[in-house]
Amino acid sequence: TSPIAEGLFDKAIIQSTNTRNFAELGEASYDLPAAEMEGVNLFKTLELKTLDAARAADPQELTNRSTMAGYAPAGTIDGTYVPRQLNEAFDDGEFAKVPVLAGFNSGEARTYRMLLPRKPKTPEAYEDAIRARYGNEAEAFLALYPADNMEESMLAVNRDNVFGGSTERIVRSAAQAGKPAYLYVFDHCYPAMEARDLCAFHASEVPFVFGTVGNPESYPPRWPQPPRRFPFPPWRYRDRAG
């Protein structure tokens, strides 16, 4: 959606994207503080007086201290590189009109449990909360995310809200612009994933896409190790075939 990137791509593969609203540079919007004010507050917390002091700091220490201070880096609507909120840009057709393959993983939220609200004590309390929040749409919500398995339903809501809705919007926008558009859901689960209740977690498709499945040294220390031999998904070769 950035005008500066116009003409840079002739096709796109988008994995587990998120088009949520971002902070705008100089003013508060969508219940988010201005990005500049976030920076000012972070500098105060870290006791940094100038940009030069921040640039001179040890990068890892700066990252660690920022994280401990509750700072979460994200995009900024700066009016130049990212001129508008992403959802607004897609809805108004202000994006690269290229063929697109976009998707998300069925277990995206399993590594984002900290984003879930506290689980209600009973299924009845869950249903009451949904009816109070969603009104006339509550029954449709409960049909998709029932109370009989609250944890799985809450994980699914987070997945669909953050990743599924964003992906669908992108694919529909590309299709409406007359471009080939495909949506996938990656739901593969191997034994090491299942043992840790992480089936199809966020980014678990990446080793398959880039062909590093058979190289255990390429994974972070806590990554569930996949079996050595697997066929690669077809989108690995899509950039060659179009």
Q: Predicted segments — roles?
A:
Residues 22-30, 86-87, 147-161, 192-196, ...:
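Active-site rim elements
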Residues 14-20, 146-150, 186, 214-215:
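Short acidic (Asp/Glu) and glycine-rich catalytic loops that position anionic groups and cofactors
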